Amino acid sequence: LSARYQLDGTELNTSPSIGIAIAPRDAQEVDTLIRYADGAMYSAKRAGRGQYRFFDPSLNRVNIQEFQFEQRFGEALRQHQFVLHYQPQICVDTLEVCGYEALVRWQHPEFGLVYPDRFIGVAERSGFIVPLGMEVLRLACRQLAAWRAEGLDTGVAVNVSALQLFQPDFSAQVLRVIAETGIEPRRLELEITETAVLDREDVAIANLEALRDAGLGISLDDFGKGYAGFAHLYSLPITKLKIDRSLIAQLSNQHDDSLIVASTITLAKRLSLRVVAEGVETRDQLICLKLGGCDVAQGYHFSRPLPAEQVHDFHDSFTTTPVA
């Protein structure tokens, strides 16, 4: 199957992935055998090109579920099974709500409410992250428009994947959604990771520059996790820096991470960037961030991500009695 062959004068080669299920050892029903073989094939694909795998219940349980997710992505999109929850972002100085981050969930008919750690990786590997990302953007913009009509003026941050940024017309698609929903561009912020712009930096930066120039906020997410460094920030058209929760987790007045976070905030300010801290869970962490000059905090200390219908009540009650 891997042999090279000619097609219309062009030499082609394939790298097959094969999944094998055996009857009656694995199952006797045809549909079950096919499903198990599909799951084994998915495991073979993840192992690399030109591989084969036998069905193994103990090793392939997770892979089979991921394969099932991949097969149902299109149906889920058509049936509007993806929903957004919104985690508040709080101004550190005033303790007022200054916006929300939109986080996608899958209201799965079989598995219930599925969190993104179970399907985003599959979506990225399969390429489905591109239509899913646009669906998330549309949902967030529609919700912003609905809130504004109800008298709630706020902003929403939406995560964007590398594959989306690599689409030459990505910025045009985003601006089209903004125009269709009638929201103010300044109310929308896109969160990216540094690795998202490394492979095709020219295309990604062109998209980001067009969106920033249109009035959108651009936030660099997960800063302090992995590759990200200040040397690369000068070339990125960003307006905000988001410190990763791994640096916030151990934050206290006595901990060395306090100096790291404070230095990060200081350097970001010199680049005229606003700073967001994610994963804030304690009052001590909030105090350290306030002393360090952080602009915005987000985390369970304030609230878990909320369904859209609960945001109004949270917004009103937090404005009246903020968490300190």
Q: Where are each of the predicted segments found?
A:
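Structural preference for long, well-ordered alpha-helical segments in enzyme cores
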Residues: 1, 33-40, 102, 122-123, ...
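Surface-exposed amphipathic alpha-helices with a cationic face
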Residues: 2, 144-148, 178-179, 205-213, ...
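Cyclic-dinucleotide signaling modules
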Residues: 1-67, 71
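Short catalytic/binding micro-motifs of nucleotide second-messenger systems
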Residues: 1-11, 43, 140-148, 178, ...
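Catalytic core of bacterial c-di-GMP phosphodiesterases, primarily the EAL and HD-GYP domains
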Residues: 52, 62, 91-101, 126-204, ...
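Active-site core of bacterial EAL-family cyclic-dinucleotide phosphodiesterase domains
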Residues: 22, 54, 65-122, 159, ...
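EAL-family c-di-GMP phosphodiesterase catalytic domain
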Residues: 24, 92-96, 107-110, 161-168, ...
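Signal-transducing alpha-helical linker
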Residues: 61-72, 78, 124, 128-133, ...
